[in-house]
């Protein structure tokens, strides 16, 4: 599902809402998550999951085309950990 599809789905479930309002709401939620992560803070949505940053050590990588070694700097990458409720709902077995 894309962001546009999410917005369309929310509007179809709530016909009283304007598309622009839903779009602004979804964008603002995502923006707030990104702002907190930029500040190095963890974001937790109970039952859904949490967003945090994981540190990646500097390492030597390899260019797949040339085979040449490439030095990769250390960096922080976003990480999502699913919450208990989400895990239970998607367990299809």
UniProtKB/Swiss-Prot annotation:
**One Gene Ontology MF term:** structural constituent of chromatin
Q: Please give the superkingdom of this protein's source.
A: Bacteria
For biological process, the GO terms are: DNA recombination; regulation of DNA-templated transcription; regulation of translation
The entry's keywords: DNA recombination, DNA-binding, Transcription, Transcription regulation, Translation regulation
Return the SUPFAM superfamilies for the record: IHF-like DNA-binding proteins
Which Pfam families does the UniProt record give? Bac_DNA_binding
**What's in the GO CC field?**
chromosome; cytosol
Task: Tell me which InterPro entries the record gives.
Answer: Hist_DNA-bd, Histone-like_DNA-bd_CS, IHF-like_DNA-bd_dom_sf, IHF_beta
UniProt entry tagged with the keyword DNA-binding: yes
Q: Does the keyword Transcription regulation apply?
A: yes
Task: Please describe what this protein does.
Answer: This protein is one of the two subunits of integration host factor, a specific DNA-binding protein that functions in genetic recombination as well as in transcriptional and translational control.
Q: Which family does it belong to?
A: Belongs to the bacterial histone-like protein family.
SUBUNIT field? Heterodimer of an alpha and a beta chain.
Q: What is this protein called?
A: Integration host factor subunit beta
Q: Which gene encodes it?
A: ihfB
């Amino acid at each position: 599902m894309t962001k546009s599809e999410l917005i369309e789905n929310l509007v179809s479930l709530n016909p009283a809402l304007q598309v622009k309002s839903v779009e602004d709401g979804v964008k603002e939620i995502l923006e707030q998550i990104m702002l907190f992560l930029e500040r190095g803070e963890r974001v937790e949505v109970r039952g859904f999951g949490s967003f945090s940053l994981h540190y990646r050590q500097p390492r030597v990588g390899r260019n797949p085309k040339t085979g040449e070694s490439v030095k990769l700097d250390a960096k922080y990458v976003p990480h999502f950990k699913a919450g208990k409720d989400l895990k239970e709902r998607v367990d299809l077995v």
